[in-house]
């Protein structure tokens, strides 16, 4: 494929270097990972609100996650499109079966990371805070290694 230069000369079109394509692919993956991380945080908070107060409202969700009402409302709409929650205007938010599964998986992963960190001697308050960042970026293989290590240590 060719193009005409500003000098009126026909030149071959240069392709993007492979490295550039790899970076673009990495950025896209990072965006998808971040979207998944946010979905996990939101469904986990919704499940906690339902368990503790019997309902999850956008205002409570925003307060719990430290975001604005508008941000929480947009996230709920995104979760609805993903089939993780149901909601009606001015009503509570409910997790679908898929949303409940994701919330449980996220909570279990969080708890495992906290147990592993505390087993290493990290204070529980620090382990809780650190787990929030770590839990979304740990592979299944690493989580399995955490479980094996904790089993070796005993109950």
Segment roles from a protein language model:
Residues 8-31, 40-43:
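Short, amphipathic alpha-helical interface elements at domain boundaries
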Residues 1-19, 129-155:
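C-terminal regulatory/oligomerization modules of transcriptional regulators
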Residues 91-110:
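Basic, amphipathic "hinge/linker" alpha-helix immediately C-terminal to the N-terminal HTH DNA-binding motif
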Residues 64, 102, 119:
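Residues within the alpha-helical elements of helix-turn-helix
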Residues 38-41, 57, 98, 109, ...:
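N-terminal positioning helix adjacent to the helix-turn-helix/winged-helix DNA-binding module
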Residues 29-67:
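N-terminal helix-turn-helix DNA-binding core of bacterial DNA-binding proteins
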Residues 56-93:
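Canonical helix-turn-helix DNA-binding module
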Residues 106-141:
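Arg/Lys-rich, alpha-helical DNA-contact motif
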């Amino acid at each position: 494929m060719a193009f005409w230069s500003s000098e009126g000369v026909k030149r071959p079109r240069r392709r993007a270097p492979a490295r550039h394509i790899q970076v673009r692919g990495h950025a896209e993956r990072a965006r998808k990972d971040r979207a998944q991380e946010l979905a996990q945080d939101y469904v986990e908070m919704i499940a906690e609100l339902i368990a503790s107060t019997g309902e999850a409202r956008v205002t409570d969700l925003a307060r719990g996650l430290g975001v604005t009402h508008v941000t929480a409302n947009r996230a709920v709409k995104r979760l609805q499109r993903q089939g993780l929650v149901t909601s009606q205007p001015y009503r509570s938010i409910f997790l679908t079966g898929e949303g409940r599964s994701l919330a449980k998986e996220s909570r279990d992963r969080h708890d495992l990371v906290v147990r592993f960190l505390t087993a290493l001697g990290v204070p529980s308050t620090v382990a809780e805070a650190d787990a929030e960042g770590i839990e979304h970026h740990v592979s299944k293989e690493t989580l399995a290694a955490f479980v094996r290590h904790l089993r070796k240590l005993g109950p």
